[in-house]
């Protein structure tokens, strides 16, 4: 399989010892493992070298790598599952973990979900450390804290809370930590799953978390005192708290002059109001408050509906359902076919 286990028998002064190397093929840099771990350990050691193999590897092996000691073998194995290399020595109660990650990741592309006219063009990808680095690159403040942890009993997914220590509210941080510690789940594959699990009221129609794929927007939110939740394997970062105002805010608002940004936000509020209440207003005016409509408009609506056998309420519900079907088809179907469905619809 992809689990690689190597055994090295090392003769030296004062006795002999075995070294076991564990790593995952495809998650680590195989060439780096060979050049910085295996090859140095196969050199001919001199008689004056200490017979303590653990210290021998610590001092002479993998000198160019980030190497740490681990007194818990389970943690060393979990590190190997993430792409590092675990080194075990016979007779030793410690293991060495060498940073050799080379995960299969896509590049940093422009966000296809949150496009904008101005600002940076990069976006998060599925790499955990890449996402935290994109935020750290924009906030070079010593007060920026990164609390890292693991969630999921089997997936062991990395996550991080990113915030500025003197800006984020302590009560908010305590609440987030409490919700995360209450997780009872085998695997977390995306930040969206973490979002659903952290919601206390599943029936609440309003989002408690705001998601973004743009590092500049996440950095601006952190600078405003909010908390960013970064999850491994997810191209989206969660921002808390999420208020109605923040949900109508885009990344362009940070770059445009305030009159332009305010006008654009007013347009968004108006569009949301129309989208939510227009069907109900249409039903109320055509069924119950006809006298509020001009006579010509009322006659036009009556003529248009003269050949329809559905009540107005059913007609509106069918229209809403068709919009949802077209939206779902545009998302799920292949890109070219989805665009065609949208045009025809």
Name every feature range the model reports, one short phrase each:
Residues 1-274, 295:
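Membrane-embedded alpha-helical signal segments
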Residues 229, 242-345:
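Transmembrane alpha-helical segments that form the functional core of multipass membrane systems
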